[in-house]
């Protein structure tokens, strides 16, 4: 991950960084609000078609705070803290302070390659070509280039799907790490591909002269579901041991 390594080398690296919870939805609710997840209305992993729970509209997110301070706000990628599904009506991302959003209620389908379930401001986009992380960054770059006031300060909340299953990555990257059908190699390739996507975004910020005045924060919502990718820590995703809660920062 040369891009992330470069950002860490020029910034601050936290070696004892912890997520808000050991599973996805609660951790994301905590990250956006700074509050214990049960207070936000999120008490477990969310499935919109099955659950009424969602990030409560009364909760104040970082996007709402920054929007009130004059920032342009946007979300890109996985959401997973509540979207309307059928008769289960839930607040929109606009209700939570985002002027614009492009992403998914949960995972990419059928996998990270050529996903079919992305939405833009609540409307389905349809089948897309490419890989989720690159698709998300392309839309983020387009938003930066076309937002109404280029001089307005901005907050971008980018939540990548990779390296969550179901896995998919370009063969030319997977082959660097092993056999094309090896799940561990594909997992590594999704991390590599995400690093390359982040590199494109950093390059755009540099090209537009915004990089030196932009704070970039990179982390994860919990530990890996692969026990062999948790740095020897006890436990993994879903566990309240360090392997479930420690994350990069």
Language-model regions, residue ranges each:
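Formylglycine-dependent sulfatase
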Residues: 1-249
């Amino acid at each position: 991950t040369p891009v992330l390594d470069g950002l860490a080398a020029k910034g601050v690296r936290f070696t004892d960084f912890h997520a808000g919870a050991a599973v996805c939805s609660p951790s994301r609710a905590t990250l956006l609000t700074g509050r214990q997840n049960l207070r936000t209305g999120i008490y477990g992993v969310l499935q919109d078609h099955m659950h009424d729970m969602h990030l409560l509209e009364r909760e104040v997110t970082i996007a709402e705070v920054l929007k009130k301070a004059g920032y342009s706000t946007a979300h890109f990628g996985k959401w997973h803290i509540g979207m309307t599904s059928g008769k289960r009506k839930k607040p929109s991302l606009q209700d939570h302070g985002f002027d614009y959003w492009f992403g998914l209620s949960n995972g990419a389908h059928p996998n990270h390659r050529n996903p079919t379930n992305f939405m833009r401001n609540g409307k389905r986009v349809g089948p897309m070509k490419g890989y989720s992380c690159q698709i998300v960054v392309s839309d983020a770059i387009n938003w930066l280039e076309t937002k109404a006031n280029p001089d307005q300060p901005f907050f971008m909340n980018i939540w990548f799907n990779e390296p969550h299953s179901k896995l998919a990555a370009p063969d030319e990257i997977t082959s660097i790490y092993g056999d094309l059908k090896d799940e561990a190699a594909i997992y590594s390739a999704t991390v590599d591909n995400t690093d390359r996507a982040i590199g494109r975004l950093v390059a755009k910020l540099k090209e537009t002269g915004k990089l030196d005045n932009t704070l970039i924060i990179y982390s994860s919502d919990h530990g890996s579901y692969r026990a062999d990718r948790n740095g020897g820590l006890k436990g993994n995703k879903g566990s309240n041991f360090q392997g479930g809660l420690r994350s990069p920062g």
